């Protein structure tokens, strides 16, 4: 997926979003999404790179547990036939829940 295709998919999730972080002072009230590509995995053989998979993280931030929003995000990922690993944590300093979806695209 290209950056543009990923951004279009993020639009489908129906929440404010940004790549990596919002500019200082521009962060919306929760819920919101962040996405980032922390790296790539390359398939290679015989000293040739045949294909590269982008790592993609989609982070859902909420001020309370909201399973319906998680389902909304997961429905979009399913529409795009994207397999993901899901984890969750509470960020004490921000008083926010983060649901992290890790995938390769």
Segments (PLM) and residue ranges:
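Long, contiguous binding/interaction regions
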Residues: 1-55, 61-105
């Amino acid at each position: 997926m290209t950056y543009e295709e990923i951004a279009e998919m993020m639009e489908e999730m129906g929440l404010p979003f940004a790549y990596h972080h919002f500019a200082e002072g521009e962060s919306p009230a929760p819920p919101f999404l962040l996405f980032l590509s922390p790296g790539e995995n390359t398939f290679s053989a015989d000293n040739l790179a045949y294909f590269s998979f982008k790592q993609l993280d989609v982070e859902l931030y909420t001020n309370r547990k909201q399973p319906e929003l998680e389902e909304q995000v997961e429905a979009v990922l399913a529409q795009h036939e994207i397999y993901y690993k899901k984890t969750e944590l509470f960020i004490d300093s921000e008083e926010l829940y983060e649901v992290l979806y890790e995938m390769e695209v």
